[in-house]
Amino acid sequence: MYLPDNFPINDKPLRPVINQFQHWDIGHVNTHLPTIYLRIVLGDLYMKNKLIIENKDLVGKWNKIEYQIKWSIRNDGFLKIYHNNQLKYSRENFVTLKGDYLYFKYGIYNWRGAGISYPYKYEFPDQTIYFAGVSASKKREDLKVNKIK
């Protein structure tokens, strides 16, 4: 993942989600809110309220993000998030799958709602993020991101 130097990190209301795991149920149009996602707040990258990457290490540099997840409808799931091979987030013994199906999406997601208030007539600034090596695997060493030189 790469945020160019011109990414609008000083735009205070801006809090884009850059990837998320979504769940949905058979027969329902609405999805559950994502339980696992990364969000940029003033140039820092967070998983909920846990800092994953500081601004000085996020903007203008390539960063490798890896998720290790045990998907479960019971309280035996876990989540680990690695930044450049360093464990930055770990949570165990919680429900990680809240629907019948799961999908992963990445890009820049800004929306009005979810507890975020934007000023009246707020205009979202131009934003660019580059992604490379996005993949899923049963083993970390088989992820595409681990084969990029």
Q: Whereabouts are the PLM-identified features?
A:
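Secretory/extracellular carbohydrate-interaction modules
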Residues: M1-L42, I108-W111, G115, E123-I148
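Residues within well-ordered beta-strands of beta-sheet-rich folds
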Residues: Y2, K61-Q68, Y82, Y130-S135
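Short loop/turn segments at connectors of secondary-structure elements within structured domains
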Residues: N10, H32, K61, I73-N75
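Short aromatic-centered micro-motifs
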Residues: L45, I81
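Short, aromatic/His-centered strand-loop micro-motif at the edge of beta-sheets
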Residues: Y46-E66, W71
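Substrate-binding/catalytic groove segments of enzymes
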Residues: W71-L79, K88-S90, E141-D142
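Short, solvent-exposed beta-strand-to-loop segments that form ligand-recognition rims
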Residues: H83-K105
